[in-house]
């Protein structure tokens, strides 16, 4: 899998034979079960992604990742709240040290 940032991509306007921009697909297959209509994942920062952002990302085809800057129970509650709001796929940041195993299991 290739990872890129904004510095790695340059879009140069050119002539195109497409009939309509609506005929293009921006969808992206994350794995066998998850396809994003819009290949954008929100940052798992406490000031960025909680339930409302996860819902907005899903509404527009992206993916929200709930931040880990709270207790394990609070994070699990936020994920459940997003699911109850209708978000079928929501992520949860777990980190790589500390309570990451407990978060992954919650």
Where do the model's predicted regions map?
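An N-cap/entry alpha-helix motif that binds or orients negatively charged groups
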Residues: 1-40
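Alpha/beta enzyme core
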Residues: 3, 9, 48-106
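Short, contiguous strand/loop micro-motifs
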Residues: 39-41, 90-91
């Amino acid at each position: 899998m290739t990872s890129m940032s904004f510095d790695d991509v340059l879009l140069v306007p050119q002539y195109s034979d497409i009939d309509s921009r609506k005929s293009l697909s921006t969808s992206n297959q994350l794995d066998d079960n998850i396809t994003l209509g819009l290949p954008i994942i929100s940052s798992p920062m406490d000031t960025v992604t909680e339930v409302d952002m996860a819902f907005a990302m899903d509404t527009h085809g992206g993916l929200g990742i709930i931040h880990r800057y709270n207790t394990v129970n609070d994070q699990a509650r936020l994920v459940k709240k997003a699911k109850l709001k209708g978000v079928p796929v929501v992520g949860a940041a777990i980190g790589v040290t500390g309570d990451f195993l407990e978060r992954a299991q919650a």
